[in-house]
């Protein structure tokens, strides 16, 4: 049975969006789609963070969701956090159209992202290839522009 989830992204500034998730089989890939507006043109890190806690804005969401205790990487890398979804790309109009399929995140089980926070970052994610310690943790993606808790959808 297909599972669906949704996340409404909001922040302190103009960045906002809605991201949808669908997983047709419990061990199958998750389709991720939607749009984010109010971004500066270019690449922005896009990650699922550990906690569904937004009591102190996006900072209380904690680090990237990483149940396997791995180093940060890109979505195509073997060595990555479960929550590492790479980058979204905003055009001149400040809109990022998101269309991703990921086989590491899940909407159920040990890698479930339900109840965790999705974050869009200020800068590009270097996918763990930046050559410093921060790159291996966060991809040097910078501040958290907007976030929201991922919830079950109809």
From Swiss-Prot:
- Positions of Zn(2+) binding: 64, 72, 81, 84
Compartment(s): Cytoplasm; Nucleus
Q: Which Pfam families match?
A: Sod_Cu (PF00080)
Q: What is its EC number?
A: 1.15.1.1
Spell out the SUPFAM superfamilies in the cross-references.
Cu,Zn superoxide dismutase-like
Give all N6-acetyllysine modified positions: 123, 137
Superkingdom: Eukaryota
Q: How is the cofactor bound?
A: Binds 1 copper ion per subunit. Binds 1 zinc ion per subunit.
Q: Where does Cu cation bind?
A: 47, 49, 64, 121
Q: Which reaction does it catalyse?
A: 2 superoxide + 2 H(+) = H2O2 + O2
Q: Which positions bear Phosphoserine?
A: 99, 103, 106, 108
Q: Which cofactor does it need?
A: Cu cation; Zn(2+)
InterPro entries assigned to the protein according to its UniProt record, in alphabetical order: SOD-like_Cu/Zn_dom_sf, SOD_Cu/Zn_/chaperone, SOD_Cu/Zn_BS, SOD_Cu_Zn_dom
Lipid attachment of type S-palmitoyl cysteine occurs at which residues? 7
Post-translational events: Palmitoylation helps nuclear targeting and decreases catalytic activity. Succinylation, adjacent to copper catalytic site, probably inhibits activity. Desuccinylation by SIRT5 enhances activity.
Q: Which residues carry this modification: N-acetylalanine?
A: 2
Tell me the Gene Ontology biological-process terms attached to this UniProt entry: auditory receptor cell stereocilium organization; embryo implantation; glutathione metabolic process; heart contraction; hydrogen peroxide biosynthetic process; intracellular iron ion homeostasis; locomotory behavior; muscle cell cellular homeostasis
Residue pairs linked by disulfide bridges in the UniProt entry = 58-147
Q: Which residues carry this modification: N6-succinyllysine?
A: 4, 10, 92, 123, 137
Give the record's GO CC terms: cytoplasm; cytoplasmic vesicle; cytosol; dendrite cytoplasm; mitochondrion; neuronal cell body; nucleus; protein-containing complex
Alphabetically sorted, this entry's keywords are:
Acetylation, Antioxidant, Copper, Cytoplasm, Disulfide bond, Lipoprotein, Metal-binding, Nucleus, Oxidoreductase, Palmitate, Phosphoprotein, Zinc
Q: Give the span(s) annotated as Disordered.
A: 62-81
According to its UniProt entry, the function of this protein is described as: Destroys radicals which are normally produced within the cells and which are toxic to biological systems.
The family note in this entry says:
Belongs to the Cu-Zn superoxide dismutase family.
UniProt subunit comment = Homodimer; non-disulfide-linked. Heterodimer with SOD1. The heterodimer CCS:SOD1 interacts with SLC31A1; this heterotrimer is Cu(1+)-mediated and its maintenance is regulated through SOD1 activation.
Name of the protein this chain belongs to: Superoxide dismutase [Cu-Zn]
């Amino acid at each position: 049975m297909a599972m669906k989830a949704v996340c409404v992204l909001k922040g302190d500034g103009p960045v906002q969006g809605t991201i949808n998730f669908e997983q047709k089989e419990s061990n199958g890939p998750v389709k991720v789609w939607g749009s984010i507006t109010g971004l500066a043109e270019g690449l922005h890190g896009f990650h699922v963070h550990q906690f569904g806690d937004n009591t102190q804005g996006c900072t209380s969401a904690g680090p990237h969701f990483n149940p396997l205790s791995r180093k940060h990487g890109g979505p195509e890398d073997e060595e990555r956090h479960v929550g590492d979804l790479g980058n979204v790309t905003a055009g001149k109009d400040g809109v990022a159209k998101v269309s991703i399929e990921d086989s590491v995140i899940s909407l159920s089980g040990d890698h479930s992202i339900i109840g965790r926070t999705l974050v869009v970052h200020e800068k590009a994610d270097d996918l763990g290839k930046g050559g410093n310690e921060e790159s291996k943790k966060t991809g040097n993606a910078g501040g958290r522009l907007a976030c929201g808790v991922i919830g079950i959808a109809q």
